[in-house]
Each structure stands twice: as C-alpha cells, then as structure tokens.
Regions:
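RNA pseudouridine synthases
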Residues: 1-219
C-alpha cells in the first residue's frame, strides 16, 4: 500500500488538494476561486496565491472559469510545466465535465462540432461562428433527468474559452446558475435553489511528466 504523502497531512494544505509529488499538484478547485490572477485586481485570491505559500512555486498548465469547480493539474518545476503544456497543446489529456442543464435535451447523446469565436458580442460571450471561429468539438451524454433539468457529461476535444457553455447555448440549453449563457426558454426552467453555476470538471486523465505513468483523477 502506498504511503500517504506527508505534505497532504499538513493543516496548512486545503482539503481540496488531492495529490502532490515533486513534479505536480492536482486540485479540486472550489467554485468562486480564480484559476489565475485577476487582470484588474491582482490582490484577489487565485490558485497560486493560495497554494504557493505552502507548496512553493507553481506553474499553471490550464485553467477553469472562476465559477467552475473541479480538477486542475499544476506543475512544480519548469520541466514538468513544459511537458504538461505540450500534452495539453496536443489535446492528449482526457477531460470530462458534469453540467446540470435546462430545459430538457431532446437527445440522449450528441456530438457538436462547431467553430467558436471568443468575445463575439458585447457581453464578451463565445459564440458559434462558421466563418471566423476556432475548431471546437464537444461530446454530450445525458446521465439523468429530473422534472425540468438534466445532468449531462461533457467531453472536450478542444479548448476554446467557454466552450461547453457556448456549445450548450447553441443547442438551446443553459447551465443552471449561469447568468451569461441563457437561451430564451432557459430562465423558467432553472432550479430556484441554485446559487452557483452547476459546471464541474469531474475527470482528468494525463501522463505524468516525469514517470510516464497514466494519472487519472475523479472528483
């Protein structure tokens, strides 16, 4: 049995740090915490500002929206950062998200391959744009259905900003708690008790940058 990493037993480490070794840190980022420093107010908390006082210097590899919770891997040295950047640039990691959406999808499974343009309107939303958009593909699978909403597994095959939210919007769906991407039929279907955007990065699979081992995390 593998011995528990003593670093994770430190009371100074947030309980949402799931794994760390000499090369990487894997976290289950809480909703509301920024992945990177805010461009207007750098003093606002973000992943590195919270973790670096305890774990030392960290390198960002990828990010989640502030409102999105879930799995992120960070590098602990420049070589690991370089290798993880290569993996993400070449779309090698497998990323699954869980989204609670409304209204009910008219399908159980669908793949949307539609190019996306970032900052496409005055609200700075990402929109499907077949002329100027970047290639983007998302697989959607309905996992369960409730009265007015459904839980959907979303698998990314590209990495455009707001990709899941924009692709769902193009399909006439919105994520519960998302104030930015709301199709006309969406508001009446929202759960009244939702206080955050119901999008969570639930699975992450990648290759360890030093050992070559396959790393798989669920949260």
């Amino acid at each position: 049995m593998e011995e528990e990493n003593p670093i994770l037993r430190s009371p100074a480490i947030p309980d949402w740090v799931l794994f760390t070794d000499e090369s990487i840190v894997v976290v289950n980022k809480p909703a509301g915490l920024r992945s990177v420093s805010d461009g207007y107010d750098p003093s606002l908390p973000h992943l590195r500002s919270v973790l670096e006082p305890v774990l030392g210097r960290l390198w960002m590899v990828h990010r989640l929206d502030k409102e999105t919770s879930g799995l992120i891997v960070l590098a602990r040295d420049a070589d690991s950062h370089r290798e993880l950047n290569r993996q993400f640039r070449e779309r090698e990691p497998i990323k699954h998200y869980l989204a609670q959406v409304a209204p009910q999808p008219q399908w159980n499974e669908i793949t949307l391959e539609a190019p996306l343009k970032v900052n496409a309107d005055r609200a700075h939303r990402t929109r499907v744009d077949f002329e100027y958009g970047k290639p983007a593909r998302t697989d959607f699978l309905v996992l369960r259905r409730e009265d007015s909403w459904a839980e959907v597994d979303c698998t990314l095959h590209s990495g455009v900003t707001h990709q899941i939210r924009a692709h769902l919007y193009h399909l006439g769906l919105g994520i519960l708690g998302d104030p930015l991407y709301q199709p006309p039929q969406f508001k009446a279907a929202q759960k009244s008790e939702v206080e955050r955007m119901m999008l969570h990065a639930s699975e992450l699979t990648f290759t360890h940058p030093k050992t070559g081992a396959l790393m798989h995390f669920q949260a």
